[in-house]
Amino acid sequence: MNITIVLGDKIPSIKYGGTQRVMWYLGKELHKRGHKVTFIAGKGSSCPFAKVIELDPSVNLNTQIPTDADIVHFNIPVPEGITKPHLLTIHGNGIPANADRNIVFVSRNHAQRLGSESFVYNGLDWDDYGPANLTLSRKNYHFLGKAAWKVKNIKGAITVVQSIKNAQLDVLGGYRLNLKMGFRFTWNPRIHFHGMVDDSKKKVIIEQSKGLIFPVTWHEPFGLAITESLYFGAPVFGTPYGALPELVSPEVGFLTAHGQEMAEHIQSAQYSPKVCHEYARDLFNSSVMAEAYLKKYETILNGEPLNKEVPHIIDIARRLPWD
C-alpha cells in the first residue's frame, strides 16, 4: 500500500514534538511491513526509510500529494477538495471547522469528549529508546512536559514534592526563570530544572526516578510523558483526567485530584520498575499502533467512514479541579 503521512512540522523531532515522533514511528513500522511510505513535512525534514516531500504552505496541499497514494494520513487540517481516501488524526482538544467522518483520536476519552468512538493509542518504537536499566537506585521524582503550560500544573507537582520530606524533583521541559508566560521564577534547591532535554538525558534521569508527578488540570488527550516514564520503570502519579485512567492502571500508578492525598500515597506505596516497564513496552509500542491504523485504512478503502457522524466538541473543560 502507498501511504502518505502529512505533518506540519519538521521530522525527525530531536527534543520535543509528540506528533512528529509518533508519526515517524508509525511510518517506520509501516515500512517494515512492506508498505511504501511518503512523508509531507516541514522544511528541513529528512527520513532514511521513506520519501520526504517538503510541505509548501503557499501551494494547494492537494497538488503536493503523490498521485500514486492509496491513502493520505493527515495530522493537519484536511484541505478542501480532497479526492484521495484519507483520515485525520486529532492530537489536541479541538476539531477543524471542515472536519469529516474519517477522524481518529488518540484515546477513548479523547474520542468520547469529541463525539466519536474512533481512536488509536499512540505507540513508540522502544528499540530507539534502548534497553531500560531497571536496577539503578531511584532517588528523585520527575516532571516531564511543557512546564510553561498552566494546564500541565508544574506548581502542583512542586507542591507535592515539597510536602514529602527531603524529596527532590527533576523538571524536564521547563526553566527556573520563565518570561514567556509572564514573570515566573522558582527558587527551591530541591527543584532541579533541566530545560528541554534530548532522549539520552531523559533516559538517564527517568531511570533513576521514583516516579512521574503529573497533576494535569485539563483533559490530557494521551500523554507520551506517561508511557515514556513507565518504559524506564517509573510509576505515574497524576490526576484522573483525560486519558490518564486508561493509561495508568493501579499496578503502575495512582490518580487523584488532591495534592495531599497524592503525597501521602507516594510515601507509602511501592511499585515494581519491571512491571511498569513491561506494561508500557507491551501495550504502547509502534507495532500495536500500526496494526490499529492499518485497520482504519482498510475500513476507509472499503468505502466505510470511521464515524457514523462528524465528530464535534462535547466536553473541552479547561482548568479542572486540583487542590
Residue spans for each PLM region:
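Nucleotide-activated donor-binding/catalytic signature segment of Leloir-type glycosyltransferases, i.e.
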Residues: 181-200
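Short alpha-helical segment that forms part of, or immediately flanks, the ligand-binding pocket
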Residues: 203, 226-231, 245-246
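Short glycine/acidic-rich beta->alpha loop that forms part of the nucleotide-sugar donor binding site
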Residues: 220-223, 230, 240
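Conserved acidic donor-binding segment of nucleotide-sugar-dependent glycosyltransferases
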Residues: 247-260, 266-270
